[in-house]
Amino acid sequence: MPAKRQQQTIKRKTAGKKSSKKMNQQRSTLLISVHRTQAVFLLLLFAMIGVLMGIGVWKAGSAIFNYVDRTSRYDKMIVAAGRRNGVYPPLLKAVIWKESRFDASARGSKGEIGLMQVMPSSAVKDWENTFRRQVPSDGALMDPALNIEIGSWFLGRALERWKDYNDAEALALCEYNAGIQRAESWKPLLHDGKVMPNIDIESTRKYVRDILERRDEYEHEWNWEKLK
């Protein structure tokens, strides 16, 4: 091979190697850039997830705290009213739990108001006539102390009415939820008989069952006797 052609061949090979090396370097730089971008994206993603989880945990914790605070803030009122009106405090608290979930501003679809969802046309009116006192407005029934006082008095009167029955609490709850006429129709023939099989309204049967179960829970978990 002539010397000149040999030199040209060597130059082409050298140039090809340099070009290939340059392309490899560019490819490596591009890959590094892509990896860095992916790493930054993942870091940002994890950071966002962490923030969202933190917010979620905080909100959940806050909700739990608020609920626990709401379920216990009326304890002294419940115990005092229960003792005055002859209602076992765990039962009274269970009724409030069922009626309003401890929401003092709760309103029912039929005009029920407050913690114990008292009815202005029945419980409130009876209480006013008995004690010769006037509730100034429906809004006043959102006052926790007044609402619990009227509701516990109404429930206590029902308990007194059914005291000769073994299922006095269940009958009183039937009266509180569905009225005295229905409670009369559901009472057992014998004083030691059971009420639940006679209740033909599913919502009332569930109402009574839920409250009695919750009463049992409060009886064992709530240290109400020490409250004054």
Locations of regions flagged by a protein language model:
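Catalytic glycan-binding domains that act on GlcNAc-containing polysaccharides
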Residues: 56-228
